[in-house]
Amino acid sequence: MEITFQDFEKLSLRIGKITSAEKIPGMKKILKVQVDVGERLATAIAGGAEFYEAASFIGKRVVVLTNMEPKTIAGVKSEVMLLAADFEGKPVWLTVDQDVPVGTKVR
């Protein structure tokens, strides 16, 4: 399915910094993370808890979709989406290798 450039422009992709990450009771594959996206702290659900320790997320600068409709997952309201590549069934978070300020727009 193709999208138009105008559709792409509707996406608010930003650099976010993960400030906290914790296991969700009863859940083995997802974590609750707090992400600083510049104008606010937002909650997200991140997959991969069976591959990564929660502490390994903290401090990472990741690419985040900030204007997605919130969705409640496992009783947690997820307000943004962290972007990841799916490599051999394992999420690999899209990160930046420089100290890019949180809230910076991704184009």
Question: What are the residue ranges of the model-derived segments?
Answer:
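Phosphate-backbone binding interfaces of nucleic-acid-interacting proteins
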Residues: M1-R107
